[in-house]
C-alpha cells in the first residue's frame, strides 16, 4: 500500500479528473444539442441569428464554461471527502475511486433534478422521473410523500454537507497543529480587529429617525404599488372567485378600498404601464404597440407626464423593481429614478436564452442570487427570474427606506401570471387534476414559432377540449396564488418595519388575460371579444386611516391611479393627466364620477374571430418587425407597417351597461353593441335593438379619437342615464 499522503493526493487527482470529465461530457452534449437546433428559432429570425450573430452565439456558449468550472469545483469539494471517508471503511483501488465519484456525482445530479422538478418543472419534461413521487402520494398518502421529500431535499444534502464539513475541520485541525504559532496568532489578531470593527459599527452612515421634515411639515405617506402581468380581477377570491386564490390580497381588500370594475385602456404591458403612470391614453403619449422605435420612446420620455416625476419633485425616493415583464422601464422609466429590472425585449437576450437553456447546469445550480450575480443575463430570461428574487429586492428597498425615513414610491412588478403560466409544482398542483397527463401539465404548451410566424393560431386553439381549458385555467389560478404570496411577504415587511400605517398600497395589474372565453383563446390585447377579461384588472387600495372598508362597483380606469395617488398624499395632479382622481369616492365626498371607458387594442398577433365578418389583419410578427442594432437590438416595427398596425386596431367605448366595439374590416368597418347586463361575454350583437345607444357611443368614440375628449356617462346619455334608452321591437 502506498504512503497515506500519496494515497490522499492520488485519490484527489482521480476525483478531479473524473468530475471534470463528467462536466466536460455535459458541456459537449449541450453544444451538440444546440448545434442540432433541438430548442431554438424555427422562424425568420433564425436566419438573422445564424448569419449576423453567429459569433455572439459562440461567445454565449463559451461564457457558460465558468459555470461548469464552478460546479466541477463544488463537486470535487463535496465528493472528495465522501470518497475518503468511504475508503476508511473499505480500501479500494483506482477504479473504485472512479465509480464512487461517478456514483456521488449522479446522486448530486439526481438531488438537484428532483428539486428542479418540484420548483421549476417547466424547465424540462421530467414526468417520467416524477411519476413515482406522484404515485407515492396516491398510494401511501401525503404524509409518506412529505417524509420522502424531506429525506431527499433535507436529510440527504445535510448529511453530505456535515460529513464533508467534519472531514475538512479534521484536516484543518491537523494543519493548524503543524502550523507555526505566529501564523495562528496573526490570524486571530486580524479576526479580532475585524470583529471589533463590525461590532462598533465604525464607518456606518446613520441617518436620524425623523418623523417630521424640515419646517415642521408632517412626513408624507409612502406609496407601494404591487402588480403582476396579466392579472385578472375576476380571478381574485375577494372579487367573488370560487377558488381561494388571493388570501393576502383579500386581507388588504377587507381593510381597504376595492374598485371592482377597473379597466386598462390597452391590454399590452408597455403601452398599459405607460398609460398607468402618465395618466394618458396611448394615442396621447404615442406608445401604441409593443415594438416602438427609439424616436417614439424618446418622444414619450420627453413629453409624457408621470407619477414618478411629480413625486420626485416632492422629495420622494422613486424606484421600480421587477423581472423580465418590467423590462420596458429600461427605455421608458416614467419618472422612476432607480430602475432595478431585467432587460428582456432584446434580440440578443432571446439568443442568449436559447443558448443557456441547452446547458442544464444553469437551472440546476445557478437560478439563485449567486447565479444571477455570476450570469446577470439570467435575470432577463422568462424561465429563470423567480418571484422570490423580485420580492427579496423589494424588501431590501423597504428596509433601506425604513432606515433613512425618506418618503418613497416603490413599484414591484411581477411576471407571475403571464403566459405560459409557469409555477413551482406546489402551486401548479393546487387546482389541477392530478390525473391530467396532457401537453399542458406544467404550463400552457405554446409553440413560440407558431406565435411569431403565423396569424391563424386562433383557429387551432379555438378547438381546445374543455378539459384542456380547465387545466390551463387551474394553472393560471396557481400563478395568482404565487403572486398573492409575494404580496403577503411585502405587506408583512412593511408591518415589521413600522411603515404599514404610513404607506398607501395599491395592488393591480397591467391588464388581464383571455382564457378561452367565447370568440377568443389566450393572450391579451388583440380583441375586445369575450367580455372584459383582457382589460379588467384589480384596483385594491390600502389607505391608512380609512374608517371602514369600501367596495365600488362603478367603472374606473388605470388612468385614474396617478391622480388618485397624488391626491391621497396631497400633491396636485399634473394638468396633462387624462385620468380622474378616485380620492373623492374614497373620502366619501362623491358617490359617482360618471366615468366612461375608452380603449383600443394593441399589436394584432393573430386574426380576430367575428362570426360572419372578415376583420382586417396584418402579416406575422417576423415579417412586420426587424432587429434594430441602433436601439440596443430591440424588436422594432418596420416603417411600412406603422399605419397598418394602427388601422387594425379595435376601439371600444364602455359604460356601466353597454359596450360598443368598432373593428376594422377588410371591406368595411364592423360595429357591434353588447348589453353587458344580459350578455357579459359579448355574444349577441344588439346594435339593431338599441340604435340610439349605438349612435351615442359611436359619436363619443369619434370625439375621443379626434379631439381627445372623453365624455362622461351624463354627456353620452343625458342626466337620466343609459337605462332610459329603450330597445326597438325585435
List where the protein language model places each region:
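Catalytic domains that recognize anionic headgroups
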Residues: 2-730
